[in-house]
Protein backbone atom coordinates (compact mmCIF):
# COMPACT_ATOMS: atom_id res chain seq x y z
CA UNK A 1 0.00 0.00 0.00
CA UNK A 2 1.49 3.31 -1.12
CA UNK A 3 0.16 6.85 -0.89
CA UNK A 4 0.95 9.87 -3.02
CA UNK A 5 -0.52 13.38 -2.99
CA UNK A 6 -0.20 14.62 -6.56
CA UNK A 7 1.15 18.13 -7.02
CA UNK A 8 -1.58 19.09 -9.45
CA UNK A 9 -3.84 22.14 -9.38
CA UNK A 10 -6.90 19.98 -9.97
CA UNK A 11 -9.34 22.87 -10.05
CA UNK A 12 -7.16 25.98 -10.04
CA UNK A 13 -6.30 25.35 -6.38
CA UNK A 14 -9.98 25.72 -5.47
CA UNK A 15 -11.57 23.10 -3.18
CA UNK A 16 -12.23 19.70 -4.77
CA UNK A 17 -15.63 18.42 -3.67
CA UNK A 18 -15.99 15.09 -5.45
CA UNK A 19 -14.31 12.48 -7.61
CA UNK A 20 -15.33 9.17 -9.13
CA UNK A 21 -13.64 6.38 -11.08
CA UNK A 22 -15.27 5.09 -14.23
CA UNK A 23 -16.33 1.43 -14.08
CA UNK A 24 -17.49 -0.89 -16.82
CA UNK A 25 -14.49 -0.33 -19.11
CA UNK A 26 -13.03 -3.81 -18.51
CA UNK A 27 -9.81 -2.32 -17.19
CA UNK A 28 -8.85 -0.69 -20.49
CA UNK A 29 -8.29 2.68 -18.82
CA UNK A 30 -8.66 4.13 -15.33
CA UNK A 31 -10.65 7.27 -16.09
CA UNK A 32 -11.31 9.60 -13.13
CA UNK A 33 -13.75 12.52 -12.94
CA UNK A 34 -13.28 15.37 -10.46
CA UNK A 35 -15.41 18.38 -9.53
CA UNK A 36 -14.82 21.54 -7.56
CA UNK A 37 -15.60 25.13 -6.73
CA UNK A 38 -14.26 26.42 -10.07
CA UNK A 39 -17.55 25.21 -11.71
CA UNK A 40 -15.71 22.70 -13.90
CA UNK A 41 -15.76 18.93 -14.19
CA UNK A 42 -12.46 17.45 -15.29
CA UNK A 43 -11.54 14.03 -16.65
CA UNK A 44 -8.19 12.40 -15.84
CA UNK A 45 -6.34 9.24 -16.76
CA UNK A 46 -4.75 7.39 -13.83
CA UNK A 47 -2.00 4.80 -14.28
CA UNK A 48 0.37 2.99 -11.96
CA UNK A 49 4.02 3.93 -12.37
CA UNK A 50 7.08 1.68 -12.07
CA UNK A 51 7.40 2.58 -8.38
CA UNK A 52 3.79 1.55 -7.73
CA UNK A 53 2.54 5.12 -7.32
CA UNK A 54 -0.21 6.79 -9.29
CA UNK A 55 0.55 8.81 -12.44
CA UNK A 56 -2.18 11.26 -13.51
CA UNK A 57 -2.75 12.68 -16.99
CA UNK A 58 -5.29 15.38 -17.94
CA UNK A 59 -7.88 14.35 -20.55
CA UNK A 60 -10.69 16.90 -20.71
CA UNK A 61 -12.33 19.92 -19.11
CA UNK A 62 -16.14 19.88 -18.96
CA UNK A 63 -17.48 23.43 -18.63
CA UNK A 64 -21.25 23.86 -18.42
CA UNK A 65 -22.15 24.38 -14.76
CA UNK A 66 -22.52 28.00 -13.65
CA UNK A 67 -21.72 27.42 -9.97
CA UNK A 68 -19.64 25.06 -7.84
CA UNK A 69 -19.96 21.35 -8.65
CA UNK A 70 -20.54 19.17 -5.58
CA UNK A 71 -20.72 15.63 -6.95
CA UNK A 72 -19.76 13.54 -9.99
CA UNK A 73 -20.82 9.93 -10.54
CA UNK A 74 -20.32 7.63 -13.53
CA UNK A 75 -23.15 5.30 -14.51
CA UNK A 76 -22.59 1.57 -13.83
CA UNK A 77 -21.75 0.99 -17.49
CA UNK A 78 -19.37 3.95 -17.53
CA UNK A 79 -20.98 5.53 -20.59
CA UNK A 80 -22.62 8.50 -18.85
CA UNK A 81 -21.23 10.88 -16.24
CA UNK A 82 -23.67 12.74 -13.97
CA UNK A 83 -22.67 15.97 -12.25
CA UNK A 84 -24.63 18.09 -9.79
CA UNK A 85 -23.86 21.48 -8.32
CA UNK A 86 -24.94 24.68 -6.65
CA UNK A 87 -26.83 25.72 -9.79
CA UNK A 88 -29.47 23.08 -8.81
CA UNK A 89 -29.17 21.16 -12.08
CA UNK A 90 -27.84 17.70 -12.91
CA UNK A 91 -25.95 17.36 -16.18
CA UNK A 92 -25.50 14.04 -17.97
CA UNK A 93 -22.30 13.92 -20.01
CA UNK A 94 -21.20 11.51 -22.72
CA UNK A 95 -18.07 11.21 -24.84
CA UNK A 96 -18.54 12.85 -28.22
CA UNK A 97 -17.01 10.63 -30.91
CA UNK A 98 -16.96 13.45 -33.44
CA UNK A 99 -13.49 14.77 -34.14
CA UNK A 100 -14.74 18.36 -34.20
CA UNK A 101 -15.04 19.63 -30.60
CA UNK A 102 -18.37 21.09 -29.55
CA UNK A 103 -18.45 24.88 -29.18
CA UNK A 104 -19.17 25.71 -25.55
CA UNK A 105 -19.82 29.27 -24.42
CA UNK A 106 -18.54 28.55 -20.91
CA UNK A 107 -15.11 27.31 -22.01
CA UNK A 108 -12.11 29.29 -23.24
CA UNK A 109 -10.61 28.35 -26.58
CA UNK A 110 -7.20 27.78 -24.97
CA UNK A 111 -8.69 25.28 -22.52
CA UNK A 112 -10.66 23.55 -25.27
CA UNK A 113 -7.49 23.00 -27.29
CA UNK A 114 -5.94 21.09 -24.39
CA UNK A 115 -8.75 18.56 -24.34
CA UNK A 116 -7.81 15.07 -25.53
CA UNK A 117 -11.43 13.92 -25.29
CA UNK A 118 -14.63 15.71 -26.24
CA UNK A 119 -17.56 15.38 -23.85
CA UNK A 120 -21.02 16.76 -24.49
CA UNK A 121 -24.16 17.21 -22.38
CA UNK A 122 -26.85 14.77 -23.50
CA UNK A 123 -29.48 15.68 -20.87
CA UNK A 124 -30.12 18.34 -18.25
CA UNK A 125 -32.23 17.30 -15.26
CA UNK A 126 -34.09 20.17 -13.59
CA UNK A 127 -36.21 19.65 -10.50
CA UNK A 128 -34.27 20.66 -7.42
CA UNK A 129 -34.66 24.18 -6.07
CA UNK A 130 -31.28 24.40 -4.35
CA UNK A 131 -27.76 22.93 -4.44
CA UNK A 132 -27.42 19.27 -5.43
CA UNK A 133 -25.16 17.53 -2.91
CA UNK A 134 -25.13 13.86 -3.89
CA UNK A 135 -26.06 11.50 -6.74
CA UNK A 136 -26.32 7.73 -7.05
CA UNK A 137 -27.23 5.41 -9.92
CA UNK A 138 -29.43 2.33 -10.00
CA UNK A 139 -27.58 -0.86 -10.86
CA UNK A 140 -29.05 -1.02 -14.37
CA UNK A 141 -28.25 2.63 -15.09
CA UNK A 142 -31.85 3.49 -16.04
CA UNK A 143 -32.74 5.29 -12.81
CA UNK A 144 -30.90 7.74 -10.62
CA UNK A 145 -31.40 9.42 -7.24
CA UNK A 146 -30.22 12.86 -6.17
CA UNK A 147 -30.06 14.70 -2.84
CA UNK A 148 -30.32 18.45 -2.36
CA UNK A 149 -30.20 21.40 0.02
CA UNK A 150 -33.93 21.88 -0.70
CA UNK A 151 -34.56 19.02 1.82
CA UNK A 152 -35.62 16.58 -0.89
CA UNK A 153 -34.38 13.51 -2.73
CA UNK A 154 -35.60 12.87 -6.28
CA UNK A 155 -35.79 9.63 -8.27
CA UNK A 156 -35.15 10.22 -11.98
CA UNK A 157 -35.91 8.27 -15.13
CA UNK A 158 -32.64 8.91 -16.94
CA UNK A 159 -33.77 7.94 -20.44
CA UNK A 160 -36.80 10.24 -20.30
CA UNK A 161 -35.14 12.91 -18.18
CA UNK A 162 -38.19 13.04 -15.91
CA UNK A 163 -38.87 12.85 -12.19
CA UNK A 164 -40.47 9.64 -10.91
CA UNK A 165 -40.70 10.40 -7.19
CA UNK A 166 -39.91 13.27 -4.85
CA UNK A 167 -39.13 12.39 -1.21
CA UNK A 168 -39.63 15.44 1.01
CA UNK A 169 -39.77 13.96 4.52
CA UNK A 170 -36.44 15.41 5.65
CA UNK A 171 -36.49 18.62 7.69
CA UNK A 172 -33.07 19.86 6.59
CA UNK A 173 -30.39 19.45 3.93
CA UNK A 174 -30.14 15.97 2.39
CA UNK A 175 -26.39 15.39 2.21
CA UNK A 176 -26.13 11.79 1.04
CA UNK A 177 -28.08 9.24 -0.99
CA UNK A 178 -27.40 5.63 -1.99
CA UNK A 179 -29.20 3.06 -4.14
CA UNK A 180 -29.72 -0.52 -3.01
CA UNK A 181 -27.94 -2.82 -5.54
CA UNK A 182 -30.90 -5.21 -5.26
CA UNK A 183 -33.28 -2.45 -6.36
CA UNK A 184 -35.49 -2.44 -3.27
CA UNK A 185 -34.42 0.65 -1.30
CA UNK A 186 -33.01 4.14 -1.56
CA UNK A 187 -31.41 5.49 1.63
CA UNK A 188 -30.82 9.15 2.47
CA UNK A 189 -28.93 10.88 5.27
CA UNK A 190 -29.59 14.46 6.32
CA UNK A 191 -28.28 16.99 8.80
CA UNK A 192 -31.70 16.73 10.49
CA UNK A 193 -29.98 13.72 12.12
CA UNK A 194 -32.30 11.14 10.55
CA UNK A 195 -31.51 8.21 8.26
CA UNK A 196 -34.47 7.46 6.01
CA UNK A 197 -34.80 4.29 3.96
CA UNK A 198 -37.39 4.48 1.18
CA UNK A 199 -39.13 1.64 -0.61
CA UNK A 200 -38.66 2.18 -4.34
CA UNK A 201 -41.70 0.07 -5.19
CA UNK A 202 -44.08 1.78 -2.73
CA UNK A 203 -42.43 5.22 -3.13
CA UNK A 204 -42.61 5.96 0.58
CA UNK A 205 -40.57 5.72 3.77
CA UNK A 206 -39.90 2.19 4.94
CA UNK A 207 -37.63 3.00 7.92
CA UNK A 208 -36.70 6.08 9.92
CA UNK A 209 -33.61 5.73 12.11
CA UNK A 210 -32.69 8.55 14.46
CA UNK A 211 -32.35 7.51 18.11
CA UNK A 212 -30.90 4.64 20.11
CA UNK A 213 -31.75 3.61 23.66
CA UNK A 214 -28.95 4.34 26.11
CA UNK A 215 -30.40 2.82 29.25
CA UNK A 216 -33.06 3.17 31.91
CA UNK A 217 -33.34 6.29 34.04
CA UNK A 218 -33.68 6.46 37.81
CA UNK A 219 -37.48 6.50 37.58
CA UNK A 220 -37.59 3.64 35.09
CA UNK A 221 -38.05 5.75 31.98
CA UNK A 222 -36.17 4.85 28.82
CA UNK A 223 -33.44 7.27 27.79
CA UNK A 224 -32.10 7.65 24.28
CA UNK A 225 -29.57 9.65 22.30
CA UNK A 226 -29.30 10.88 18.74
CA UNK A 227 -27.33 8.52 16.50
CA UNK A 228 -26.10 11.10 13.99
CA UNK A 229 -24.31 14.43 14.16
CA UNK A 230 -26.21 17.67 13.82
CA UNK A 231 -25.40 20.52 11.44
CA UNK A 232 -22.28 21.45 13.42
CA UNK A 233 -20.34 18.88 11.36
CA UNK A 234 -17.61 20.61 9.39
CA UNK A 235 -18.33 18.56 6.28
CA UNK A 236 -21.26 19.26 4.00
CA UNK A 237 -21.45 15.68 2.80
CA UNK A 238 -22.69 12.47 4.41
CA UNK A 239 -22.06 9.99 1.62
CA UNK A 240 -23.53 6.67 2.77
CA UNK A 241 -23.29 3.44 0.78
CA UNK A 242 -24.70 -0.05 0.35
CA UNK A 243 -22.17 -2.85 -0.11
CA UNK A 244 -22.01 -4.16 -3.72
CA UNK A 245 -24.13 -7.19 -2.81
CA UNK A 246 -26.69 -5.12 -0.91
CA UNK A 247 -26.21 -7.08 2.32
CA UNK A 248 -25.06 -4.11 4.41
CA UNK A 249 -25.82 -0.39 4.62
CA UNK A 250 -22.89 1.72 5.85
CA UNK A 251 -23.70 5.20 7.19
CA UNK A 252 -21.17 7.88 8.20
CA UNK A 253 -21.65 10.92 10.46
CA UNK A 254 -22.58 8.69 13.39
CA UNK A 255 -22.01 9.52 17.05
CA UNK A 256 -22.31 7.39 20.16
CA UNK A 257 -23.02 9.10 23.47
CA UNK A 258 -22.02 7.40 26.69
CA UNK A 259 -22.37 9.69 29.66
CA UNK A 260 -20.24 12.74 28.97
CA UNK A 261 -18.29 11.07 26.15
CA UNK A 262 -19.15 11.36 22.46
CA UNK A 263 -17.50 8.96 20.01
CA UNK A 264 -17.50 9.45 16.24
CA UNK A 265 -18.50 6.32 14.38
CA UNK A 266 -19.84 4.68 11.24
CA UNK A 267 -22.95 2.52 11.62
CA UNK A 268 -23.38 -0.87 9.98
CA UNK A 269 -26.93 -2.00 9.17
CA UNK A 270 -27.97 -5.40 7.86
CA UNK A 271 -30.64 -5.38 5.16
CA UNK A 272 -32.41 -8.03 7.27
CA UNK A 273 -33.18 -5.33 9.83
CA UNK A 274 -32.64 -1.71 8.80
CA UNK A 275 -34.30 -0.40 11.98
CA UNK A 276 -31.14 -0.63 14.05
CA UNK A 277 -27.41 -1.12 13.43
CA UNK A 278 -25.73 -4.45 14.03
CA UNK A 279 -22.39 -2.76 14.71
CA UNK A 280 -20.57 0.53 14.67
CA UNK A 281 -17.00 1.31 13.67
CA UNK A 282 -15.37 3.94 15.92
CA UNK A 283 -13.25 6.61 14.29
CA UNK A 284 -10.54 8.45 16.26
CA UNK A 285 -10.86 12.20 16.49
CA UNK A 286 -13.03 13.48 13.68
CA UNK A 287 -16.48 12.71 12.30
CA UNK A 288 -16.83 10.38 9.32
CA UNK A 289 -18.31 11.77 6.10
CA UNK A 290 -18.09 9.17 3.32
CA UNK A 291 -18.10 5.40 2.82
CA UNK A 292 -17.22 3.75 -0.50
CA UNK A 293 -16.97 0.02 -1.18
CA UNK A 294 -14.39 -1.65 -3.38
CA UNK A 295 -16.26 -3.20 -6.35
CA UNK A 296 -14.12 -6.36 -6.23
CA UNK A 297 -15.31 -9.48 -4.39
CA UNK A 298 -12.49 -11.28 -2.59
CA UNK A 299 -12.04 -14.83 -1.36
CA UNK A 300 -12.32 -15.40 2.38
CA UNK A 301 -9.08 -15.45 4.32
CA UNK A 302 -8.19 -18.84 5.79
CA UNK A 303 -8.62 -19.05 9.55
CA UNK A 304 -6.76 -21.06 12.16
CA UNK A 305 -9.71 -21.65 14.44
CA UNK A 306 -13.43 -21.24 13.95
CA UNK A 307 -15.18 -18.46 15.83
CA UNK A 308 -18.51 -16.67 15.74
CA UNK A 309 -18.55 -14.41 12.71
CA UNK A 310 -19.88 -10.86 12.73
CA UNK A 311 -20.76 -10.73 9.02
CA UNK A 312 -21.37 -14.20 7.61
CA UNK A 313 -20.78 -13.88 3.88
CA UNK A 314 -19.38 -16.47 1.43
CA UNK A 315 -16.92 -13.84 0.20
CA UNK A 316 -15.02 -10.85 1.56
CA UNK A 317 -15.83 -7.21 0.78
CA UNK A 318 -13.50 -4.26 1.37
CA UNK A 319 -14.63 -0.70 2.06
CA UNK A 320 -13.07 2.63 2.97
CA UNK A 321 -14.38 5.14 5.50
CA UNK A 322 -13.30 8.77 5.16
CA UNK A 323 -13.36 11.08 8.15
CA UNK A 324 -12.54 14.78 8.13
CA UNK A 325 -8.80 14.06 8.26
CA UNK A 326 -8.17 10.34 7.67
CA UNK A 327 -9.22 7.20 5.80
CA UNK A 328 -9.75 3.81 7.44
CA UNK A 329 -9.85 0.52 5.52
CA UNK A 330 -12.15 -2.31 6.63
CA UNK A 331 -13.36 -5.64 5.35
CA UNK A 332 -16.40 -7.74 6.20
CA UNK A 333 -14.35 -10.49 7.84
CA UNK A 334 -13.31 -8.41 10.83
CA UNK A 335 -14.68 -5.57 12.89
CA UNK A 336 -11.54 -3.45 13.18
CA UNK A 337 -9.60 -1.65 10.44
CA UNK A 338 -6.71 -3.27 8.62
CA UNK A 339 -5.33 0.01 7.29
CA UNK A 340 -5.20 3.69 8.22
CA UNK A 341 -4.12 6.74 6.21
CA UNK A 342 -3.77 10.21 7.74
CA UNK A 343 -1.86 13.50 7.58
CA UNK A 344 -2.11 13.78 3.81
CA UNK A 345 -4.18 16.97 3.52
CA UNK A 346 -4.37 20.35 5.21
CA UNK A 347 -8.16 20.66 5.06
CA UNK A 348 -11.24 18.48 5.34
CA UNK A 349 -11.57 15.48 3.04
CA UNK A 350 -14.60 15.53 0.75
CA UNK A 351 -14.92 12.27 -1.20
CA UNK A 352 -13.30 8.90 -1.96
CA UNK A 353 -13.57 6.47 -4.88
CA UNK A 354 -12.27 3.00 -5.84
CA UNK A 355 -11.09 2.00 -9.30
CA UNK A 356 -12.90 -0.90 -10.95
CA UNK A 357 -10.06 -3.36 -10.22
CA UNK A 358 -9.42 -2.13 -6.67
CA UNK A 359 -5.88 -1.01 -7.53
CA UNK A 360 -6.53 2.66 -6.68
CA UNK A 361 -8.36 4.52 -3.93
CA UNK A 362 -8.69 8.22 -4.76
CA UNK A 363 -9.17 10.84 -2.02
CA UNK A 364 -10.25 14.46 -2.58
CA UNK A 365 -9.90 17.38 -0.19
CA UNK A 366 -11.08 20.95 0.17
CA UNK A 367 -7.45 22.07 0.21
CA UNK A 368 -7.55 21.73 -3.59
CA UNK A 369 -5.52 18.52 -3.90
CA UNK A 370 -6.19 14.81 -4.36
CA UNK A 371 -4.31 11.76 -3.12
CA UNK A 372 -4.11 8.16 -4.29
CA UNK A 373 -3.67 4.96 -2.30
CA UNK A 374 -2.32 2.22 -4.57
CA UNK A 375 -2.40 -1.51 -3.89
CA UNK A 376 -0.29 -4.24 -5.43
CA UNK A 377 -1.84 -7.31 -7.01
CA UNK A 378 -3.60 -9.51 -4.42
CA UNK A 379 -2.58 -7.13 -1.61
CA UNK A 380 -6.21 -6.65 -0.61
CA UNK A 381 -6.96 -10.32 -1.21
CA UNK A 382 -7.52 -12.86 -3.96
CA UNK A 383 -10.40 -11.75 -6.22
CA UNK A 384 -13.22 -14.17 -6.93
CA UNK A 385 -13.14 -15.54 -10.45
CA UNK A 386 -16.84 -14.82 -10.90
CA UNK A 387 -18.97 -12.23 -9.15
CA UNK A 388 -22.09 -13.50 -7.37
CA UNK A 389 -25.35 -13.07 -9.28
CA UNK A 390 -27.60 -10.52 -7.56
CA UNK A 391 -31.36 -11.05 -7.40
CA UNK A 392 -32.34 -7.56 -8.49
CA UNK A 393 -35.76 -5.96 -8.31
CA UNK A 394 -36.87 -3.07 -10.50
CA UNK A 395 -40.01 -0.91 -10.23
CA UNK A 396 -41.25 -2.31 -13.56
CA UNK A 397 -40.81 -6.01 -12.82
CA UNK A 398 -41.02 -6.30 -9.03
CA UNK A 399 -44.09 -8.05 -7.70
CA UNK A 400 -46.16 -6.33 -5.05
CA UNK A 401 -45.45 -8.54 -2.09
CA UNK A 402 -45.40 -7.96 1.61
CA UNK A 403 -42.21 -6.58 3.02
CA UNK A 404 -39.70 -9.32 3.85
CA UNK A 405 -38.00 -7.16 6.43
CA UNK A 406 -37.98 -8.64 9.93
CA UNK A 407 -40.28 -6.59 12.14
CA UNK A 408 -39.46 -7.96 15.56
CA UNK A 409 -36.48 -7.34 17.71
CA UNK A 410 -33.60 -9.74 17.30
CA UNK A 411 -32.59 -12.29 19.95
CA UNK A 412 -30.55 -11.01 22.84
CA UNK A 413 -26.84 -10.39 22.53
CA UNK A 414 -24.22 -12.98 23.26
CA UNK A 415 -20.43 -12.79 23.58
CA UNK A 416 -18.31 -13.33 20.47
CA UNK A 417 -15.78 -16.13 20.84
CA UNK A 418 -12.19 -15.02 20.80
CA UNK A 419 -13.06 -11.44 21.73
CA UNK A 420 -13.67 -9.58 25.02
CA UNK A 421 -16.78 -10.83 26.73
CA UNK A 422 -18.39 -7.40 26.56
CA UNK A 423 -18.38 -7.41 22.75
CA UNK A 424 -21.73 -8.80 21.68
CA UNK A 425 -23.50 -9.34 18.42
CA UNK A 426 -26.88 -9.93 16.90
CA UNK A 427 -27.00 -13.63 15.89
CA UNK A 428 -29.20 -12.79 12.91
CA UNK A 429 -26.64 -10.43 11.49
CA UNK A 430 -23.70 -11.15 9.18
CA UNK A 431 -20.50 -12.13 10.94
CA UNK A 432 -16.76 -11.79 10.94
CA UNK A 433 -13.94 -14.25 11.38
CA UNK A 434 -10.92 -13.29 13.49
CA UNK A 435 -8.01 -12.70 11.11
CA UNK A 436 -5.46 -14.94 12.83
CA UNK A 437 -4.30 -16.35 9.51
CA UNK A 438 -4.36 -13.15 7.53
CA UNK A 439 -1.81 -12.94 4.76
CA UNK A 440 1.04 -10.61 5.56
CA UNK A 441 1.08 -7.42 3.47
CA UNK A 442 4.22 -5.87 2.04
CA UNK A 443 6.56 -4.29 4.61
CA UNK A 444 5.64 -0.69 5.39
CA UNK A 445 7.36 2.01 7.39
CA UNK A 446 5.26 3.17 10.31
CA UNK A 447 5.68 6.73 11.46
CA UNK A 448 3.89 8.78 14.10
CA UNK A 449 1.05 6.39 14.96
CA UNK A 450 -2.07 8.42 15.85
CA UNK A 451 -3.87 8.12 19.12
CA UNK A 452 -6.69 5.66 18.63
CA UNK A 453 -9.91 5.57 20.58
CA UNK A 454 -9.65 2.53 22.86
CA UNK A 455 -12.17 -0.23 22.50
CA UNK A 456 -15.31 0.22 24.56
CA UNK A 457 -15.45 -2.62 27.06
CA UNK A 458 -19.18 -2.76 27.63
CA UNK A 459 -22.44 -2.00 25.84
CA UNK A 460 -23.39 1.64 25.91
CA UNK A 461 -24.52 2.16 29.54
CA UNK A 462 -26.46 4.67 31.51
CA UNK A 463 -28.60 7.65 30.59
CA UNK A 464 -27.15 10.21 28.25
CA UNK A 465 -28.04 13.72 27.21
CA UNK A 466 -27.87 15.18 23.75
CA UNK A 467 -24.61 16.97 23.12
CA UNK A 468 -23.77 19.51 20.46
CA UNK A 469 -20.41 18.91 18.85
CA UNK A 470 -18.39 22.06 18.31
CA UNK A 471 -16.18 22.12 15.25
CA UNK A 472 -12.53 22.57 15.98
CA UNK A 473 -10.79 25.53 14.45
CA UNK A 474 -8.36 24.99 11.61
CA UNK A 475 -5.10 26.77 11.18
CA UNK A 476 -3.57 25.94 7.87
CA UNK A 477 -0.36 27.83 8.43
CA UNK A 478 0.39 26.12 11.71
CA UNK A 479 -0.10 22.66 10.22
CA UNK A 480 3.13 20.69 9.82
CA UNK A 481 4.40 19.66 6.42
CA UNK A 482 2.56 16.81 4.75
CA UNK A 483 3.43 13.31 5.69
CA UNK A 484 1.70 10.00 5.26
CA UNK A 485 0.99 7.68 8.15
CA UNK A 486 0.13 4.12 7.18
CA UNK A 487 -0.98 2.11 10.18
CA UNK A 488 -1.88 -1.54 10.20
CA UNK A 489 -2.85 -3.88 12.96
CA UNK A 490 0.41 -4.28 14.86
CA UNK A 491 1.11 -0.55 15.02
CA UNK A 492 -2.15 0.59 16.62
CA UNK A 493 -1.05 0.23 20.21
CA UNK A 494 2.53 1.52 19.89
CA UNK A 495 3.21 4.67 21.90
CA UNK A 496 6.48 5.68 20.26
CA UNK A 497 7.30 5.73 16.54
CA UNK A 498 9.61 3.06 15.27
CA UNK A 499 10.33 1.16 12.07
CA UNK A 500 8.80 -2.28 11.89
CA UNK A 501 7.90 -4.86 9.27
CA UNK A 502 4.30 -5.95 9.12
CA UNK A 503 3.63 -9.55 10.08
CA UNK A 504 0.37 -11.49 10.33
CA UNK A 505 -1.57 -11.04 13.55
CA UNK A 506 -0.64 -13.85 15.94
CA UNK A 507 -3.21 -15.94 17.68
CA UNK A 508 -1.94 -14.93 21.09
CA UNK A 509 -2.18 -11.19 20.48
CA UNK A 510 -3.99 -9.69 23.49
CA UNK A 511 -7.38 -8.17 22.59
CA UNK A 512 -6.43 -4.89 24.25
CA UNK A 513 -3.76 -4.23 21.64
CA UNK A 514 -6.24 -4.30 18.78
CA UNK A 515 -8.85 -1.55 18.29
CA UNK A 516 -12.21 -3.22 17.99
CA UNK A 517 -15.55 -1.94 16.87
CA UNK A 518 -18.45 -1.86 19.24
CA UNK A 519 -21.35 -4.12 18.48
CA UNK A 520 -24.52 -2.18 19.12
CA UNK A 521 -27.43 -4.18 20.45
CA UNK A 522 -29.97 -1.73 21.93
CA UNK A 523 -33.08 -1.11 19.88
CA UNK A 524 -33.54 1.98 17.78
CA UNK A 525 -36.68 4.03 18.06
CA UNK A 526 -38.61 4.23 14.83
CA UNK A 527 -39.79 7.74 14.12
CA UNK A 528 -42.59 8.11 11.62
CA UNK A 529 -42.77 11.88 11.41
CA UNK A 530 -40.26 13.67 13.56
CA UNK A 531 -38.98 17.19 13.87
CA UNK A 532 -35.43 17.28 15.25
CA UNK A 533 -35.47 18.18 18.90
CA UNK A 534 -32.04 19.69 19.24
CA UNK A 535 -31.87 23.34 20.13
CA UNK A 536 -29.49 24.24 17.34
CA UNK A 537 -31.61 23.26 14.38
CA UNK A 538 -30.64 26.13 12.14
CA UNK A 539 -29.23 25.28 8.70
CA UNK A 540 -25.46 25.35 8.32
CA UNK A 541 -23.76 28.26 6.69
CA UNK A 542 -22.86 28.27 3.03
CA UNK A 543 -19.96 26.02 2.08
CA UNK A 544 -17.73 28.84 0.94
CA UNK A 545 -17.81 32.25 -0.73
CA UNK A 546 -19.37 32.06 -4.14
CA UNK A 547 -17.21 31.93 -7.21
CA UNK A 548 -17.73 35.58 -8.04
CA UNK A 549 -16.12 36.44 -4.69
CA UNK A 550 -13.03 34.35 -5.40
CA UNK A 551 -12.12 35.05 -8.96
CA UNK A 552 -8.77 33.83 -10.11
CA UNK A 553 -7.17 31.94 -12.93
CA UNK A 554 -4.98 28.92 -12.96
CA UNK A 555 -1.94 29.35 -10.79
CA UNK A 556 1.39 27.63 -11.10
CA UNK A 557 1.97 25.13 -8.35
CA UNK A 558 4.73 25.75 -5.84
CA UNK A 559 7.24 22.94 -5.68
Curated annotation (Swiss-Prot):
<dbReference type="GO" id="GO:0005737">
    <property type="term" value="C:cytoplasm"/>
</dbReference>
<feature type="modified residue" description="Phosphothreonine">
    <location>
        <position position="509"/>
    </location>
</feature>
<dbReference type="InterPro" id="IPR019775">
    <property type="entry name" value="WD40_repeat_CS"/>
</dbReference>
<dbReference type="GO" id="GO:0051082">
    <property type="term" value="F:unfolded protein binding"/>
</dbReference>
<feature type="modified residue" description="Phosphothreonine">
    <location>
        <position position="495"/>
    </location>
</feature>
<feature type="modified residue" description="Phosphoserine">
    <location>
        <position position="458"/>
    </location>
</feature>
<comment type="function">
    <text>Acts as a component of the histone chaperone complex chromatin assembly factor 1 (CAF-1), which assembles histone octamers onto DNA during replication and repair. CAF-1 performs the first step of the nucleosome assembly process, bringing newly synthesized histones H3 and H4 to replicating DNA; histones H2A/H2B can bind to this chromatin precursor subsequent to DNA replication to complete the histone octamer.</text>
</comment>
<feature type="compositionally biased region" description="Low complexity">
    <location>
        <begin position="430"/>
        <end position="444"/>
    </location>
</feature>
<feature type="repeat" description="WD 5">
    <location>
        <begin position="228"/>
        <end position="279"/>
    </location>
</feature>
<dbReference type="InterPro" id="IPR045145">
    <property type="entry name" value="PTHR15271"/>
</dbReference>
<dbReference type="Pfam" id="PF15512">
    <property type="entry name" value="CAF-1_p60_C"/>
</dbReference>
<dbReference type="InterPro" id="IPR036322">
    <property type="entry name" value="WD40_repeat_dom_sf"/>
</dbReference>
<keyword id="KW-0853">WD repeat</keyword>
<keyword id="KW-0227">DNA damage</keyword>
<comment type="subunit">
    <text>Subunit of the CAF-1 complex that contains RBBP4, CHAF1B and CHAF1A. CHAF1A binds directly to CHAF1B. Only minor amounts of RBBP4 are complexed with CHAF1A and CHAF1B in G1 phase. In G2 and S phase also monomeric CHAF1B is detected. Interacts with histones H3.1, H3.2 and H3.1t.</text>
</comment>
<feature type="repeat" description="WD 3">
    <location>
        <begin position="127"/>
        <end position="166"/>
    </location>
</feature>
<keyword id="KW-0597">Phosphoprotein</keyword>
<feature type="repeat" description="WD 2">
    <location>
        <begin position="64"/>
        <end position="103"/>
    </location>
</feature>
<keyword id="KW-0156">Chromatin regulator</keyword>
<keyword id="KW-0007">Acetylation</keyword>
<feature type="modified residue" description="Phosphoserine">
    <location>
        <position position="429"/>
    </location>
</feature>
<feature type="repeat" description="WD 1">
    <location>
        <begin position="11"/>
        <end position="54"/>
    </location>
</feature>
<dbReference type="GO" id="GO:0003682">
    <property type="term" value="F:chromatin binding"/>
</dbReference>
<feature type="region of interest" description="Disordered">
    <location>
        <begin position="386"/>
        <end position="559"/>
    </location>
</feature>
<feature type="repeat" description="WD 4">
    <location>
        <begin position="169"/>
        <end position="208"/>
    </location>
</feature>
<dbReference type="InterPro" id="IPR029129">
    <property type="entry name" value="CAF1_p60_C"/>
</dbReference>
<keyword id="KW-0539">Nucleus</keyword>
<dbReference type="GO" id="GO:0006335">
    <property type="term" value="P:DNA replication-dependent chromatin assembly"/>
</dbReference>
<dbReference type="GO" id="GO:0042393">
    <property type="term" value="F:histone binding"/>
</dbReference>
<feature type="modified residue" description="Phosphothreonine">
    <location>
        <position position="531"/>
    </location>
</feature>
<dbReference type="GO" id="GO:0033186">
    <property type="term" value="C:CAF-1 complex"/>
</dbReference>
<dbReference type="GO" id="GO:0005634">
    <property type="term" value="C:nucleus"/>
</dbReference>
<dbReference type="GO" id="GO:0006334">
    <property type="term" value="P:nucleosome assembly"/>
</dbReference>
<dbReference type="InterPro" id="IPR001680">
    <property type="entry name" value="WD40_rpt"/>
</dbReference>
<feature type="repeat" description="WD 6">
    <location>
        <begin position="299"/>
        <end position="340"/>
    </location>
</feature>
<feature type="compositionally biased region" description="Basic and acidic residues">
    <location>
        <begin position="541"/>
        <end position="552"/>
    </location>
</feature>
<dbReference type="GO" id="GO:0000785">
    <property type="term" value="C:chromatin"/>
</dbReference>
<feature type="modified residue" description="Phosphoserine">
    <location>
        <position position="409"/>
    </location>
</feature>
<feature type="compositionally biased region" description="Low complexity">
    <location>
        <begin position="509"/>
        <end position="526"/>
    </location>
</feature>
<dbReference type="InterPro" id="IPR015943">
    <property type="entry name" value="WD40/YVTN_repeat-like_dom_sf"/>
</dbReference>
<comment type="similarity">
    <text>Belongs to the WD repeat HIR1 family.</text>
</comment>
<dbReference type="GO" id="GO:0006281">
    <property type="term" value="P:DNA repair"/>
</dbReference>
